[in-house]
Structure formats: structure tokens, C-alpha cells
Amino acid sequence: MRRLVLLLAISLLLYQDLPVRSEFELDRICGYGTARCRKKCRSQEYRIGRCPNTYACCLRKWDESLLNRTKP
């Protein structure tokens, strides 16, 4: 009976998504200073690679109309 309780407790601990890294490493700057390290990129961000802490390097999407502006 003890083994069953022990196995249940261990499986519950392993099932949880325990943070391996500190919370300070979540919003680190990556991508030559233009992006952020996140567990998952937000809906308005592109994933451009991986951070040293194995999280995704997320770059904010930009409005293409701002890039193609021409002065009259």
C-alpha cells in the first residue's frame, strides 16, 4: 500500500510542469536585442529561434504598411 501511494505521489509530481529555469530568464532579450524569450510566443509574435534557456525567441509582428511608406 505504501508503494502505491509513493508511486502515485511521484507520478503527480512528474505530471506537473515544474519550472526548470527561473522566472527572470523568461523575458530575456534575444534576436540581437529585438525579441524576447518566452515559453510560448504570443499571438502577435513570430518564433524566430531558440534562446539559450531552450525557450522560444519571439519577435513581435510588424505592420507591413509601415514598412512600405513612401514620402509624397
Curated annotation (Swiss-Prot):
Species for this entry: Pongo pygmaeus (Bornean orangutan)
Name the record gives this protein: Beta-defensin 104A
Gene Ontology annotations of biological process type: defense response to bacterium; innate immune response
Function as written in the Swiss-Prot or TrEMBL entry: Has antimicrobial activity.
Compartment(s): Secreted
Sorted UniProt keywords: Antibiotic, Antimicrobial, Defensin, Disulfide bond, Secreted, Signal
Family: Belongs to the beta-defensin family.
GO cellular component: extracellular region
Alphabetized InterPro entries for the sequence: Beta_defensin_dom
Primary location group: secreted
SS bond list: C30-C57, C37-C51, C41-C58
Signal peptide: 1-22
